Amino acid sequence: QRQMCIRDSNGPILTIRKFPNQPITIQTLIEIGSITREAAEFLKSLVIAGYNIFISGGTGSGKTTFLNALSCFIPETERLITVEDSAELQIQGIANLVRLEAREANLEGKNAVSIRDLLRSALRMRPDRIILGEVRDAAACELLTAMNTGHDGSLSTGHANSPQDMLNRLETLVLMGMDIPLEAVRSQIASAIDIVVQLGRLRDRSRKVLTIAEVAGMQEGHIVLRDIFQFQERGEAEDGTVVGNLQWTGAKLSQTTKLELAGVKVPCG
């Protein structure tokens, strides 16, 4: 669990964020209606094949929970390195697991270890995959470098309201750490990230996968996104529950090389 204590005008405020003793699995997410079985099988195939997947969503949308669920599909023989600001991930079933955690500076302002430092170190540790708990600063540069230098199957999360917003935010974060042309940044992002999964918290407080989009390269200087799955709302039940489900749009994946090399097929897309 994580705690945060801060004082406001009325006195101290303590916020406690508790995690379940056992990680929530993809099967649980299917049962509660957060994702359909078809979409879950689709993502399972992509994780096994080594697609780089970014999970996007607002605060409290379930990004860390979903990242944990997807990590269960990583082959247990692979070497996995996780990088986090504070340890939240509950990775299970991976024997060769290295967990790196950032550290703030001491009272003298020394001995800080940043996410960027840890990502640079992770690249020297021969990982098969890297999981970054959340990208929120110029560490996005190192993450894209990892994804573009043979570390397929990497996963991360970020705060954004749509797949396009997530890519736009990544552009901004990269430019915070590198002085390069915007088109070069977009090219790096387009070649690094394969899939963006958008999560959302609906008005009935349920958490859903809203979109699964493929990053389908560049066109006229802009990154192309193609929706493979999209949540379709059909109204509300009498108790106010949002009625709808995640549906395949009929679009096919344009980038299938990783699937072919891994000998993996997807149920759709």
Describe each region flagged by the PLM:
Residues 205-269:
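NTP-binding/hydrolysis catalytic cores, primarily Walker-type P-loop NTPases
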Residues 20-31, 48, 68, 72-120, ...:
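P-loop NTPase switch/communication element
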Residues 38-42, 114-118, 139-142:
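Well-ordered alpha-helical segments embedded in enzymatic catalytic cores
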Residues 1-6:
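Short, small-residue-biased leader/transition segments that mark boundaries at the very start
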Residues 10-56:
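Glycine-rich adenosyl-nucleotide cofactor-binding module
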Residues 63:
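Conserved lysine of the Walker
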Residues 60:
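Walker A (P-loop) phosphate-binding loop of P-loop NTPases
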